Amino acid sequence: MRTFRIFPSILNANFEKLPEEIARVAATADYIHLDVMDNIFVPNFTFDLARSKEIIDASSLPIDVHLMVVNADVAGIEYAQTNASSVTVHFEACENVSRTLQGIRDLGKRAGLAIKPGTPISAIEPFLAQLDMVLVMTV
């Protein structure tokens, strides 16, 4: 039988009570999913790198970072240098997808690739051997 893992997002957490929020999620989850948005690639802003590091370092669970940012080539490597366990970048935001994925993996992290709803799945086929996960957005 397959094992499924739960990756809840903490996007709606009360950040004034972050340690308690993370502990509450940790009681029933396998990972924490951290959505990082820059208000350029997507029309919302969540966390910058410094705040993300605080969240990552406060967690007893592995952190799965999903970067919805421009310049994902640079950001992917920056986030892979944190204590996050995995980093997912958007195909549409990378200038050199293969190099970025390899850089993430070279830093010992799981590498993921996300695509927007309008991007054909065939766009990521050349990179499947470098991927630990794929995220297909629905919004």
Predicted regions and their residues:
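Conserved N-terminal beta1-alpha1 strand-loop-helix module at the mouth
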Residues: M1-T88, E92-N96, Q102-A111, I124-L131
